[in-house]
Regions:
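A solvent-exposed interaction/effector surface
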Residues: 1-128
Length: 128
């Protein structure tokens, strides 16, 4: 997770510079190529609606309220694809259409817990 190690401190600093209270570390996933192990992801933190971020490298993004399918995933990140596959199977079985981005909220992880079995990631799929 070197991407997050590099970028989350910048995101947190810019949010604090805006005098806002950041929520938990979050990933916004816009594309995921499982075959090639590549993703288009943004490091993010939730902030109060209307927060103005005055930064050339960090921007505020509004994600409108939506119906969602959520899964709490416990474990190391190298097995998280199993949770995604289960969610996608559920969406297909229930004829739900996935909206972009999907959201990962890192409730516990390497920054605050060494035992990977205690890592908790909340995965949120916005749906139509």
């Amino acid at each position: 997770m070197s991407f997050f190690s590099e970028h989350m401190p910048i995101v947190y600093q810019e949010v604090q510079n805006a005098n806002a209270s950041p929520g938990t570390a979050t990933g916004l996933i816009y594309a995921w190529d499982e075959k090639n192990q590549q993703t288009d992801i943004a490091a993010a933190v939730p902030v109060e609606a209307g927060t103005k971020i005055n930064s050339p490298i960090v921007q505020a993004t509004n994600i409108p309220a939506s119906k969602a399918v959520c899964v709490n995933y416990n474990g190391a990140y190298d097995k998280i694809a199993d949770a995604y596959n289960s969610i996608r199977q559920y969406l297909a079985e229930n004829k739900l259409k996935e909206k972009i981005p999907s959201i990962e909220q890192y409730i516990t992880g390497p920054a605050n817990e060494k035992d990977t079995s205690k890592w908790l990631t909340k995965i949120v799929f916005l749906v139509e």
